[in-house]
Amino acid sequence: MANHSSAKKVVRQTVKRTLINKKRSSAIKTFIKKVIHEISRGNKEDANLALSIAQSKIMQGVKKNIIKLNTASRKIRRLSKQIKNLYKSE
């Protein structure tokens, strides 16, 4: 346990940052799930709209160091590929 006041402050800051990061991470996952849901329903326009919003949130997560750039790029690429396959299946 922290004894010095500065160490106690660091513990408080860590707890605060952890909660904020979990909230942001959860929001990113929620937007990704919305895209997947629209893809499963077959709504091309709604899926594209959801992807653009999710892509924005994912890149904001990269900027805030919630997820790494390569991970974000991979998630966006895979979602885009699924939407592209919706158009091919016509």
Swiss-Prot record:
The keyword Transferase does not apply. GO terms for cellular component: small ribosomal subunit. GO terms for molecular function: small ribosomal subunit rRNA binding; structural constituent of ribosome. One of its GO terms (biological process) is translation. Belongs to the bacterial ribosomal protein bS20 family. The lineage of its organism: Bacteria, Pseudomonadati, Pseudomonadota, Alphaproteobacteria, Rickettsiales. InterPro entries: Ribosomal_bS20, Ribosomal_bS20_sf. The gene is rpsT. Keywords: Ribonucleoprotein, Ribosomal protein, RNA-binding, rRNA-binding. Coiled coil: none annotated. SUPFAM superfamilies: Ribosomal protein S20 (SSF46992). This is Small ribosomal subunit protein bS20.
